[in-house]
Amino acid sequence: MSGSSYANCLLELERKKSHTPTGAAAIARIAAEDPELAVLTEARIGHRESFGGYEIASQPPAGERFAADERKALAWSQNPWRNVDAVGDERMPIGRFVAGTTTTSVGDVRVMAICIPWHMCDVRYGSKDRKPWEQHLRWLECFGELMAAESSLPVVVAGDFNQRIPRRKGAPSDVADALASVFAAFDIVTSGVPAGCARPGIDHIAINDRLQRASVRGWPNDQGGTRTSDHDGVVADVHLAR
């Protein structure tokens, strides 16, 4: 649909401050895409001030090892947010979800920024009372119920899924199946190896049937010799489904 696409950028910032070479390079890379929407994980609040626009963030993560400005999930838009939800489902591990509705060139869009727990969450750190993949599966179960009740608007879900799609070594088949079930009604446009990248990622963009992909491309985490992150970035242009 001519004139109705928007760019959604996703980048892992690896807790770097914006005035460090790594953080500054990451911010510059996102700015170069001139997105309408951006979703970031493992990032710091307030570091997209140079963009203008509006930011929403998940609740602070639990644990003393996190700085006061660290967040697991952030979403940014050129336009104001409304109907913001930083809880989702109270049973989900805290601080890994934020959602809001914003206006884009395709109209109103519901954006859900997420950071699904990695397989060792609360195993090596935190409460240390969980088994591998337990928190990941628990989060997916609760998030799946939340997704089923979401709005009829165009929906974008983006963030760190902590799984490669399709499944490769690492995730047990039941874990991959759980993720697939939650997103059965969505198109995960970043599946496989995005153009511009040399490997599949664990950061993804998923869209519901109100939207269609126009293009998807990625960029490696090394930008001109500067390591901007421990993950690659990805951007998708989408339009309203015909």
Language model segments and positions:
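Structured beta-strand-rich core segments of catalytic domains in phosphoester-bond hydrolases
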Residues: A31, E36-V39, A43-H119, G218-W219
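Surface-exposed cleft-lining segments at the edges of enzyme active sites
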Residues: D85-E90, I116-R138, I165
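Active-site environment of divalent metal-dependent phosphoester hydrolases
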Residues: K16-T20, I45-E49, C121-D122, N162-P166, ...
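Short, flexible/disordered intra-domain loops and linkers
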Residues: K17-P21, V123-K131, P166-D174
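Metal-dependent phosphoester-hydrolase catalytic domains
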Residues: A32, E36-L37, A86-G88, A149, ...
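Soluble or luminal CAZymes and related metallo-dependent hydrolases
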Residues: S18-T22, M92-I94, K131-C142, V175, ...
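Active-site-proximal beta-strand elements of phosphoester/diester hydrolases
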Residues: G3-K16, D108-D129
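Active-site beta-strand/loop signature of hydrolases that rely on acidic residues for catalysis
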Residues: Y6-L13, A26-R48, V111, C142-R168, ...
